[in-house]
Amino acid sequence: MSEIIHRQESFEIMGACFEVYKENGPGFLEEVYHECLKIEFRLRNIPFLSKEPLPLTYKGHRLVTSYEPDFICYDRIVLEIKAVTSVADIHRAKVKHYLKSSVLRLGLLVNFCHYPKLEHERIVL
């Protein structure tokens, strides 16, 4: 059996996500969940960067375009949040691109508009 990377940190991040879902439920805009998570992360002392640009390169040349994941927590976990009916392959691909363009190995994809419970996936490179 393979080791689960960043087990404790991802557990703490997901705890904050579950709390936001419990308080708000589904149906809000993604930006609302984003703001609520920033508050919840501060309350739980979870270190995070919000919308921090990830630089992109092509053949050693830095691109003007960059990726901006919703959160980078603990300097090692990408958290991408959604407020959609269901998570699609394009959402998973987006998280994988974030990981490929950085040194990070773990991404969490969380959908707050799924009912009756929070939808979430771990994506590991």
What are these regions (language model features)?
Residues 82-125:
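Nucleic-acid nuclease catalytic cores
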Residues 42-59:
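A short acidic/basic microdomain associated with nuclease active sites
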Residues 1-47, 123-125:
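Solvent-exposed, charged helical/coil patches
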Residues 25, 69-87, 98:
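Conserved catalytic cores of phosphodiester-cleaving nucleases, focusing on short active-site segments
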